[in-house]
From Swiss-Prot:
Its main location: membrane. Pfam families: ATP-synt_ab, ATP-synt_ab_C, ATP-synt_ab_N. It catalyses: ATP + H2O + 4 H(+)(in) = ADP + phosphate + 5 H(+)(out). Produces ATP from ADP in the presence of a proton gradient across the membrane. The alpha chain is a regulatory subunit. GO terms for cellular component: plasma membrane; proton-transporting ATP synthase complex. It is an enzyme of class 7 (translocase). It is found in: Cell inner membrane. The record marks 362 as: Required for activity. SUPFAM superfamilies: C-terminal domain of alpha and beta subunits of F1 ATP synthase (SSF47917), N-terminal domain of alpha and beta subunits of F1 ATP synthase (SSF50615), P-loop containing nucleoside triphosphate hydrolases (SSF52540). It comes from the Bacteria. ATP binds at residues 169-176. This is ATP synthase subunit alpha. It comes from Kosmotoga olearia (strain ATCC BAA-1733 / DSM 21960 / TBF 19.5.1). Keywords: ATP synthesis, ATP-binding, Cell inner membrane, Cell membrane, CF(1), Hydrogen ion transport, Ion transport, Membrane, Nucleotide-binding, Translocase, Transport.
Length: 502
């Protein structure tokens, strides 16, 4: 009996169809060295840069160094269970984090794993942590203000939605306080917030979470935490994970704010990883691509045009300086990447001027076009007045006789400095800021004792809320200083001043 080749093929095909054996095909390698959170593997020929790989014990790693004969992998979990000779396999994907409104009110690590004990997160989608920043044609100029609720910032260093504004200063000068106040002030503003804690003490982070819950700000906030006891890999990934979560809102046509606290520790974590991976060190032992580390992160903040949904992602990176040195490597890098900086001066802080913003060294390069017209008209001369006051103050120390104009300028500067002081966790709506600054810039406080200024401010706001609520409402809605609004403000300030003086 002759069997044709086609019949043999048919029989083989039928047998194969009946077979239920599945072949699990994957590319794998072997660990040749492990230690200090770094594993070196041989045999992963097709692995991609930044690809997620899985170890035999279930832990994941990130392929960062692709060398001729081995791959340098940073371990994302506990590396002590991984040993030489273990199998490591490719996953074919890059790190993704959950994104969406399910993350609001939650505390997660940079891999999106919940840390708050409130159960699993049912995210609507996952986004890659590293993604290309929006191109030029997708963007539009910054034109909408992001109110921080801090008088000194909203008046003189305004921030717009889609801007990158650096907060820089020595340790314990109030950098995080400004960021937290900004989050609290976004209530009912339609801005979703992501706070990224990099290398912070757990106790400090717990205090921040308590404050945000107490003020009701956790409803629209996600916290991404890589604390001081987490591996350097998680500290390195944290800001990118935070940016990915914020981009979800931006690409959905909404507004988001992301705070990176702080990028000095992020750069230190990256330096640690790079040195362990034997990458050549450069200035201050940082690797050569440390500028790109932060530029690719901060370029993801943008204001999209209407064709792409019109959403925005605003970034407030924080940098900690050492002994007031803003010309160090990392501070100068980030200053050159961002659209301005808020410089906090330790001398002002210890003198009791809080927030301790040094107006002369702080600038917002694009926020001016986003500032509302009413604030522009009221605070236009404020920055110059304060800068001149600081200059005159230095000269006045060496001079005994001052002319009347100089004396008047010194008095005005002193009153304005006092007026710009603000308690922590008490952000102020923009219409109330305008009312207070109107009194200061128009000279109504010049002859009041300096220690009574805060009391006057309190009384003015109380009266405005009770008797002149229509004026505040008009400022809030029209966003401009019309003759009618100015007349209302003038009457309110004069009434309060008269009652206060008497």
């Amino acid at each position: 009996m002759k069997i044709s080749p086609s019949e043999i093929t048919k029989i083989i095909e039928e047998q194969l169809k009946r077979s239920d054996r599945e072949i699990d095909y994957f590319e794998a390698g072997r660990i040749i060295q492990v230690g200090d959170g770094i594993a070196r593997a041989y045999g992963l020929k097709g692995v991609m840069s930044n690809e997620l790989v899985q170890f035999e014990n279930g832990e994941y790693g990130l392929a960062l160094n692709l060398e001729e004969d081995n791959v340098g992998i940073v371990v994302l979990g506990d590396y002590r269970e991984i040993k030489e000779g273990d199998l490591v396999k490719r996953t074919g994907r890059i790190i993704e984090v959950p994104a969406g409104e399910a993350l609001l009110g939650r505390v997660v690590n940079p891999l999106g794993i919940p840390l708050d004990g409130k159960g699993p997160i049912e995210a609507s989608e996952h986004r890659p942590v590293e993604i290309k920043a929006p191109g030029v044609v997708m963007r539009k100029p910054v034109d909408t203000p992001l109110q921080t609720g801090i008088k000194a910032i909203d008046a003189m260093i305004p921030i717009g939605r889609g801007q990158r504004e650096l907060i820089i200063g020595d340790r314990q000068t109030g950098k995080t306080a400004i960021a937290i106040d900004t989050i609290i002030n976004q209530k009912d503003q339609g801005v979703y917030c992501i706070y990224v804690a990099i290398g912070q003490k757990t106790a400090v982070l717990a205090r921040i979470i308590d404050k945000l819950e107490e003020t009701g700000a956790m409803e629209y906030t996600t916290i991404v935490a890589a604390t001081a006891n987490d591996p350097a890999t998680l500290a390195y990934l944290a800001p990118y994970a935070g940016a990915a979560m914020g981009e979800y809102f931006m690409y959905s046509g909404k507004d988001a704010l992301v705070i990176y606290d702080d990028l000095s520790k992020h750069a230190a974590a990256y330096r640690e990883l790079s040195l362990l991976l034997r990458r050549p060190p450069g200035r201050e032992a940082y690797p050569g691509d440390v500028f790109y580390l932060h530029s690719r992160l901060l370029e993801r903040a943008a204001r999209l045009n209407e064709e792409h949904g019109g959403g925005s992602l605003t970034a407030l990176p924080i940098i900690e300086t050492l002994a007031n040195d803003v010309s160090a490597y990392i501070p100068t890098n980030v200053i050159s990447i961002t659209d301005g900086q808020i410089y906090l001066d330790p001398n002002l802080f210890y003198a009791g001027n809080r927030p301790a913003i040094n107006v002369g060294l702080s600038v917002s390069r694009v926020g001016g076009s986003a500032q509302i017209k009413a604030m522009k008209k009221i605070a236009g001369s404020l920055r110059l007045d304060l800068a001149q006051y600081r200059e005159l103050l230095a000269f006045a120390q060496f001079s005994t006789e001052l002319d009347k104009a100089t004396q008047a300028q010194l008095i005005r500067g002193e009153k304005l400095t006092e007026l710009l002081k603000q308690e922590q966790y008490s952000p102020m709506p923009v219409e109330e800021q305008i009312a207070v600054l109107y009194a200061g810039t128009r000279g109504y406080l010049d002859d009041l004792p300096t220690d009574k200024i805060r009391q006057f401010e309190k009384q003015l706001l109380q009266t405005m809320r009770q008797k002149y609520a229509d004026v505040l409402k008009a400022i809030r809605e029209k966003k401009d200083m019309t003759e009618e609004i100015e007349a209302g403000l003038k009457k309110a300030v004069e009434d309060v001043r008269q009652a206060f003086v008497s």
